Amino acid sequence: MKARRSLLASAALLLALASAGAPALADELPTFQLTFKADGTFEPQRLEVPAGRFKIELSNESKEPVEFESIPLRKEKVLGPGVKSFVVITISRPGEYPFFDDFHQDVKGTLVVKPKE
């Protein structure tokens, strides 16, 4: 019983330390901006990024909740009105990847992944 508690405490400490370093690592990534505008559009609608690992900072300027979603990238993030957040994406294959606002499905954009230089 004592060994199990010790193991659980060690696992909890390891998890806490691992998650504490995650925001710092995300801050060091190449960063791009994507804004949900009050008029129901994305800005920009085409976001160009280099292949690899990067961060997209999301900002909701509308008065409604929005959701960044990309099925091929397997990413989604819900933002309330006026909220800012981010997603970290790792993709090595250049190409065009659609994304949309799941709450307003006619609002669409494209992530254009360029080859790494």
Tell what function each PLM region has.
Residues 58-60:
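Asparagine-centered strand-capping/turn motif at beta-strand->loop junctions
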Residues 21-26:
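Sec/Tat signal peptide C-region and signal peptidase I cleavage site
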Residues 28-51:
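N-terminal edge beta-strand
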Residues 1-11:
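Bacterial N-terminal signal peptides that target proteins for export
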Residues 10-19:
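Bacterial N-terminal signal peptides
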Residues 44-45, 74-78, 87-88:
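Beta-strand-rich interaction surfaces with strong enrichment in secreted/lumenal proteins
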Residues 27-33, 63, 79-117:
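Extracellular/periplasmic metallocenter environments
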